[in-house]
Amino acid sequence: MKLQDSLRKIIRQSGSGRWVQGSGAVQGACDTLPGDPGAGGSPFLMKLLAAAVLLAGGLASGCASDASSGEQNPSLAAEAAESVSENQKSGIRSGGAAGSPSYARAKGNAKLTIWVADYQGYNGIAKVGERFTRDTGVKVNVVHYGQADVQFQYASAAGVAPDIFLSGHDRFGEWAKEGLIAQLAPGAEEKARFTGLAWDAVTIGGKIYGYPMGIWALGLICNRKLVPDAPENWEDFIALDNKLQKKGVRAIYWDYTTPYYTYPLISANGGYSFKKASDGFYDTGKTGVANEGAKSGLKFLIDLIWNGHMRKGADYGVMQQEFSGGRLGCILDGPWSWAGYDQAGIDFSVNRLPKLNGMRSRPFVSVQSFVISASSPNRDLAVDFLENYLLTDDGIRDVNDDVAIGVPALRSFQALSGRNSRIAATMENVRGGDLIPSIPEMYRFWSAFQTALREAVTGRQGADEALEDAAKGIAKQ
């Protein structure tokens, strides 16, 4: 059935097609996360929005491109649907292996489609895909999106998901619950090749749902020319800013109204999102976003801003621009940004996050991992590609040479990267960080904490009141 027919069928089932009018669905796909307030959460609306989004050519050309050719892809929905159709004809089913009859029939006939975000080294993945094609005859199509997680969830609901998808682990719990991603069964030898932390991130309820690649955590990134020695304490930035302002430069800036970036300040003295209970599951009825440690962190941020040591108005793009232009001493950013600062000609260091009140900041830790769509008829091919081609020293090198993957989850490549000071510093931040809980309730945390940050830094609410309101919203059942 064509995707257009699928949309018509869904509309007929609903009795109304009014939800797919104008360009609202397209805009929402790029800018709104499923589960956020106003995004719509029912299975029917998800499927309807998915079909509408994927049918819209404007979204495909505006949010994604074909990594293989570097050209804009006019219809990713058609590409995905074609891939599913071709692979179904090949007779590939889950549970096969290289050398099995189903695998043999796939050669020269099937196609693996891989979706990644714009910042995730798609050129390197495409390079590995070319080797896989030469060896097996199976075509590999690598597609990249601006809002990749959003597109994956919509495409899964519409039945046109890619075979493989690269994402941070924090959505896996939700996707596993919704049946969007396949449970995996790597052998003991395969598991031994990766760090335990990486497997912990992709394990939901004792079951594995992803193959880990790189581990991300924020670091304190400093321009060596302006700040030869990175500050050890957050409090040190006050004197440093007084000094650098005389040169027309600011000491520190980051996207401080985005929870991911400001979490290190509230976590330094004991703030947290959710903690695991004794049964191994997160206690979502309790949050540490409003404890005394969290409040002290937010108050310090407010003081930095209102005492003139950090510009008013948080903007990630402005931060990148100012740092790339040599007008910022230090920023908070992650491995995905390193290549851009290198290209800008900035000699920078990556350092451990500073201490606040003598306690080390704890960043959120994200494990970038590959999942296999539950609807993919090519799980055996996908596993072969991931285990024997991409997640090897040669494969990871190709991806890392394109865009830094952070701390390698692959032990052997981690050993090869041991002398890299950026990776070493990121490793320290990872070890001292908090793994992002892979639970749907994190939406409450992101939303409520962001509101608290915006209210507090603008003075509309005090730090205590803003965080206490956030805690009520986060811990609601």
Question: Where are the regions that the model predicts?
Answer:
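Short, solvent-exposed loop/beta-turn-alpha elements that line the ligand-binding surface or hinge
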Residues: S102-A106, P186-F194, Y272-S296, Q343, ...
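Extracytoplasmic/periplasmic substrate-binding proteins
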Residues: K127-V128, K299-L381
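C-terminal capping/gating helix-and-loop segments adjacent to ligand/active sites or protein-protein/ligand interfaces
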Residues: A117, T203, F370, D401-R411, ...
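Hinge/lid segment of periplasmic solute-binding proteins
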Residues: V84-G108, H169-G219, D229, W234-D241, ...
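Conserved N-terminal structural module of periplasmic/extracytoplasmic solute-binding proteins
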Residues: K2-Q4, R8-R12, A52, G57, ...
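Extracytoplasmic "Venus flytrap"/periplasmic binding protein-like
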Residues: K127-F194, Y209, R224-P228, E232, ...
